A protein has these predicted regions:
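A conserved donor-nucleotide-binding helix/loop in the catalytic core
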Residues: 35, 62-90, 97-106, 113-116, ...
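N-terminal anchoring/stem segment of glycosyltransferases
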Residues: 1-73, 77-84, 221-225, 234, ...
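Non-transmembrane alpha-helical segments in soluble domains
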Residues: 44, 104, 185-189
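Short, high-confidence coil segments that cap the C-terminus of an alpha-helix
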Residues: 84, 109-112, 193, 213-215
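Charged, glycine/proline-rich intrinsically disordered loops and linkers
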Residues: 15-32, 123-143
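Catalytic phosphate/metal-binding cores of nucleic-acid and nucleotide-processing enzymes, i.e., regions
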Residues: 57-58, 93, 143
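Catalytic core and acceptor-binding pocket of nucleotide-sugar-dependent glycosyltransferases
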Residues: 146-241
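Conserved donor-nucleotide/metal-binding helix-loop-beta segment in metal-dependent transferases, i.e.
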Residues: 95-141
């Protein structure tokens, strides 16, 4: 079966809580549409290079609060899995570097949920570090499980097997009073889905700073992207990502 790379880009204005997540929003200082289009082009090229499908979802389906919840459809709609046995989700502020290897060939397991290493979870030891990860819905879970399963949800690979294991918990998303990232981690913990830990270079935040190693996928995550926007654009252009 084929592999697929999926992005979502739907105007938040079409939802009941458009300000729920303002990390990628048009303003007089930031062309979010242009930024997201550049991300999509990078993954379309990446998918074509390795003969995978690329799908950009631009119409709402779940229609719950904000477009960030739309990715739960990957668990809920059986039609995805009639054609694919693996789907990689990527945020619309993630960019595939031209020389990035084929992630599906790098991590071949079809029985696990594949997420990137994330030190904020795996290496949290100080009280202030633990407070950042062990709250909300996750406060109901054991800290060791939160540290083990925790990940940054801007990049992940969902296999059909993992989808089937996690689905009963993802189905509860409207009943869970927390953000989508916590719901994903909670579903991992509750389902005890087997994990594959992928290299952080497939979800790397500060690639545009000098001295940082070459990454495979650059994630311009968080509000700091607006502070460093010029530097980010320079970095992308040097990589040939227009």
């Amino acid at each position: 079966m084929k592999k697929c790379i999926v992005q979502y880009w739907i105007p938040s204005s079409e939802y009941t809580h458009p300000g729920y997540n303002n990390l990628l929003k048009n303003s007089n200082k930031f062309d979010a549409d242009g930024f997201a289009n550049r991300s999509a082009r990078s993954f379309e090229l990446y998918a074509n290079k390795y003969n995978h499908d690329f799908v950009r979802v631009t119409e709402k389906k779940l229609n719950y609060k904000h477009p960030t919840f739309e990715r739960f459809d990957l668990w809920l709609d059986d039609h995805w899995w009639e054609k694919y046995d693996e789907i990689m989700y990527v945020d619309s502020d993630v960019f595939a570097m031209p020389e990035a290897p084929d992630i599906f060939q790098h991590y071949k397991s079809l029985g696990t949920f594949k997420v990137c290493e994330h030190d904020a979870f795996q290496k949290a030891t100080l009280p202030e570090q633990i407070d950042l990860i062990h709250h909300g819905l996750l406060k109901k879970c054991k800290l060791d499980e939160v540290k083990h399963y925790g990940f940054q949800p801007g990049v992940f690979i969902l296999t059909k097997t993992a989808r089937d294991i996690m689905r009963p918990y993802i189905e509860q998303f409207k009943e869970l009073n927390d953000h989508d990232g916590h719901i994903l981690i909670w579903a991992c913990i509750q389902s005890q889905v087997p994990l594959t830990r992928m290299s952080r270079y497939y979800n790397y935040k500060k690639a545009y700073f000098k001295g940082h190693p070459e990454s495979y996928f650059f994630h311009a995550a968080g509000h700091k992207k607006l502070v460093h926007l010029g530097r980010i654009y320079d970095f992308l252009e040097k990589k040939g990502l227009q």
